Amino acid sequence: LLAEKETDLRLQQRYTQQLQALLKPLPVAEFIRDFISQVWSQALMHAARLDGDDSARVKRLRHAARELIMSVQPKGLPEQRKAFLMQLPTLMKELNEGMDLIGWPESAKKTFFGLLLPAHAESLKGQALRTLDYNLLARQADSALGEAMPDAAELPPPQANIPVLRDEVIEPRFAAEEAQRIGLVDEAAV
């Protein structure tokens, strides 16, 4: 199980780097780019491990990431604002589903939503993107989020020497059933 977790963390790190590179050229707020590459990538990888890369849940989570990117784009027309407000509950539900899937802490959720809410409010005031620009951004987001997730076969063998900290440390998270299998107990139970 621990070797599996190590491989999962290495895959997660690779996918995070992949998404960061793919999302970098997109005109998106940095907190959204960071959230998708660092947090949402974990939800996508976890769902893919549980259900397979082409599962309905993975497709739904990819779509939610695309909708998140598009949700903060300016909406100048009343029809655009109305469509956004109609889609918002579904987006929030899917974001919460993904965050719950990886056990993202409540405090981090509050911080993220504290940034997202003003971005959504600001998007309702701005000058709408031209249709061409909107469609181009949507395609770029689809392309970035549609890239294949890394596979364990693509990973180089683990380093036998002492690892060098190059990036943020991705905190390993164990599902309740995994924690039980390796003998971990919940802090509240101690």
Please report, for each region that a protein language model flagged, where it lies by residue.
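Extended, low-complexity, amphipathic alpha-helical coiled-coil/linker regions that act as scaffolds
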Residues: 1-190
